[in-house]
A protein has these predicted regions:
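Conserved catalytic alpha/beta core of Sir2/sirtuin-type deacylases, generalized to analogous enzyme cores
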Residues: 1-142
């Protein structure tokens, strides 16, 4: 089926009729939160915030991380997440990552073997921390 669709597209010369909107780069600007104008989308944390978060991470025995701190899928906005991964690695804490985006980022940046546990189940991880049980496991046990 896929080959048929592709062949039909080629036969109708749709490549020249279909248009897309794209961006080859997003401009990176640094600002403090109090000077962000309405309508501006914040996409990552900056160096000062990484430094601030690091103060809380260093010396912790256990860190549970759920959610990247920026849109780390884009190279221009991976700074915060990548640097938090490095701080977590160096902290010596037992680090538990919960959530698909955080897990994917840690693995993409080469940290998959540096943390105690990585789970793609963000909501399930939070549920387990809150309730000390998981709905799926409870159903199996019954």
């Amino acid at each position: 089926l896929e080959c048929t669709i592709i062949e039909n597209i080629k036969n109708f010369n749709l490549e020249n009729r279909i248009n897309v909107i794209y961006s080859d780069a997003l401009e990176v600007k640094y600002s403090s939160m109090d000077s962000i104008e309405d309508g501006i989308m914040v996409l990552d944390i900056g160096p000062k915030t990484v430094e601030l978060f690091s103060k809380y991470i260093i010396g912790s025995k256990t860190v549970f991380w759920n959610g990247p701190v920026g849109v780390s899928e884009f190279k221009n906005f991976e700074y915060g997440t990548k640097n938090i991964c490095e701080v977590l690695k160096k902290s010596g804490a037992d680090v538990i990552i919960g959530g698909g985006d955080s897990a994917a980022a840690a693995i993409r940046f080469g940290y998959k073997d540096d943390f105690a546990h990585i789970s793609t189940g963000g909501g399930a991880s939070l549920e387990f921390i809150e309730k000390q049980s998981l709905t799926a496991l409870n159903a199996i046990e019954e």
